[in-house]
């Protein structure tokens, strides 16, 4: 990334419940998630090195519009977690030092989610702590803006928060 930047978070997290999960989302430019050192989600823009060189399994959903992504939301492969914490690595980056955006959502297999008027499930944001009241209000404004202006949506749920484990 010539004039860009890349942020990397690595730590231990515990899922809210055992079972199978998958990530949904999109980023302009780069978004990559690994669980226990195995890539499970690549939600980068079409011209990202992550998408073109790493070959992480990904499915595009153009019928689910998302921000400025012609490919719509991307989904990763299902992964299973138990009671023990797992290592998570999140990479997010921008290549041109201009504006950036991204969204990372998490789906639990078997749960049902409220849907938008165009049929997109409102999967919860991937969170490691529940937002404070002011942050919740800002997220609600963002959700409404997304639904009315640029499509895409999400939910915020206490039941979907992944807990950061000590030692992270």
Where are these predicted regions, by residue range?
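Acidic/polar, compositionally biased interaction segments
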Residues: 1-168
């Amino acid at each position: 990334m010539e004039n860009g930047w890349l942020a990397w978070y690595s730590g231990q997290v515990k899922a809210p419940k055992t079972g199978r999960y998958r990530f949904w989302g999109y980023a302009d430019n780069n978004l990559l998630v690994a669980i226990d050192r195995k890539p499970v989600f690549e939600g980068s823009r079409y011209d990202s090195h992550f998408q073109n060189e790493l070959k992480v399994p990904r499915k595009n959903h153009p019928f689910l519009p998302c921000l400025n992504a012609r490919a719509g939301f991307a989904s990763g492969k299902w992964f299973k977690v138990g009671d023990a914490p797992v290592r998570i690595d999140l990479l997010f980056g921008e290549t041109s030092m201009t504006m950036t955006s991204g969204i990372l959502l998490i789906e639990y297999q078997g749960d049902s989610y409220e849907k938008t008027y165009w049929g997109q499930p409102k999967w919860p944001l991937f969170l490691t702590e529940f937002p404070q009241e002011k942050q919740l209000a800002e997220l609600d404004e963002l959700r409404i803006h997304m639904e009315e202006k640029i499509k895409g949506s999400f939910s915020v749920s206490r039941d979907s928060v992944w807990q950061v484990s000590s030692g992270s």
